[in-house]
Amino acid sequence: MIDKQKTIQTYAKSANDTGSTAVQVALLTERINNLSRHLTENKKDKHGQRGLQLLNGQRRRLLKYLERTNYDEYIALTDRLGIRRGQRIVR
């Protein structure tokens, strides 16, 4: 089960920070990890697989935004959460 308050406190920049990109990515990562564990035991849960795809897409979009706006924080967050990074495309 996800301990939402603990995750928010861990990744928040201030006491009232509950919606920053880093916090959102951390919460999504917790949900993704939880759902992945569920799907290893329940391989035929097709609705769960669809939900996992949606969560991964949402996290990918948030990480893309964070990479574009604050690259140093993006690097630190992906290292901290253990998320693989793609190649950086400079435009």
UniProtKB/Swiss-Prot annotation:
MF GO annotations: rRNA binding; structural constituent of ribosome
Entry keyword Ribosomal protein: yes
Entry-linked SMART domains: Ribosomal_S15
A biological process term (GO) from this entry: translation
Protein name per UniProt: Small ribosomal subunit protein uS15
InterPro entries: Ribosomal_uS15 (IPR000589), Ribosomal_uS15_bac-type (IPR005290), uS15_NS1_RNA-bd_sf (IPR009068)
Family annotation (Gene3D superfamilies): 6.10.250.3130, S15/NS1, RNA-binding
Record text on subunit structure and interactions: Part of the 30S ribosomal subunit. Forms a bridge to the 50S subunit in the 70S ribosome, contacting the 23S rRNA.
Record flagged with keyword RNA-binding: yes
Keyword annotations of the record: Ribonucleoprotein, Ribosomal protein, RNA-binding, rRNA-binding
Function: One of the primary rRNA binding proteins, it binds directly to 16S rRNA where it helps nucleate assembly of the platform of the 30S subunit by binding and bridging several RNA helices of the 16S rRNA.
Pfam families recorded: Ribosomal_S15
Family statement drawn from the similarity comment of this UniProt entry: Belongs to the universal ribosomal protein uS15 family.
CC terms in the record's Gene Ontology section: cytosolic small ribosomal subunit
Organism of provenance: Deinococcus geothermalis (strain DSM 11300 / CIP 105573 / AG-3a)
NCBIfam families per UniProt: S15_bact
